[in-house]
Amino acid sequence: MELNVTTLEGKAAGSVNLSDTIFGLEPRTDIIQRVVNWQLAKRQAGTHKTKGRAEIARTGKKMYKQKGTGGARHGSARVPQFRGGGRAFGPVVRSHAYDLPKKVRALGLRHALSAKAKDGSLVVLDNAELKDAKTKALIGHFSGLGLTSALIVDGAEVNNGFAQAARNIPHIDVLPIQGINVYDILRRQKLVLTKAAVDALEARFK
């Protein structure tokens, strides 16, 4: 598929041929969902914790004698049925991460890219470079391009001035090509790739 290339100023800068094996797939939401769930599970803190009966600071002595009271039989006061007792099967500190095959992760990325291309939400920039790190100037460029919510992906190195200028703009994310991922692609309305990013993606999935 062929897509027009624009500059930051909104001027035409030729066109680029995009590989159908990366940008022309019929998006499969089930694969995309698997990758997003994997990403979110991996970044979950997992610091939740409640005390079990073994961790409660309370005596382990038998509460009262076994027989002759007319009451139910009880041993420890740390058990869950008593006020102040430990939680039964409570959450513990753990990692929520799980494995997802590399091929599924790669396929999920290609389907996310194809989904943006199919929706008309893919923009290709000639380059993402700013001489002066001025947020006001960059906001003007973005409004001219109609970008209010976008993920901008550059080549192996992001231009320092561009990254600094974009840092304070809400709903705008800037990543190098190594950081491109399914979740960040989907959470913004537009996906903006530089020509360097397109070349890197095509080399990666060759």
From Swiss-Prot:
Keywords from the named record: Ribonucleoprotein, Ribosomal protein, RNA-binding, rRNA-binding
GO terms under biological process: translation
GO terms, molecular function: rRNA binding; structural constituent of ribosome
Annotated GO CC locations: ribonucleoprotein complex; ribosome
InterPro entries according to UniProt: Ribosomal_uL4, Ribosomal_uL4-like, Ribosomal_uL4_dom_sf
Keyword Hydrolase in annotation: no
Record's function text: One of the primary rRNA binding proteins, this protein initially binds near the 5'-end of the 23S rRNA. It is important during the early stages of 50S assembly. It makes multiple contacts with different domains of the 23S rRNA in the assembled 50S subunit and ribosome. Forms part of the polypeptide exit tunnel.
Binding partners and assembly: Part of the 50S ribosomal subunit.
Family to which this protein belongs: Belongs to the universal ribosomal protein uL4 family.
Name of the molecule in the record: Large ribosomal subunit protein uL4
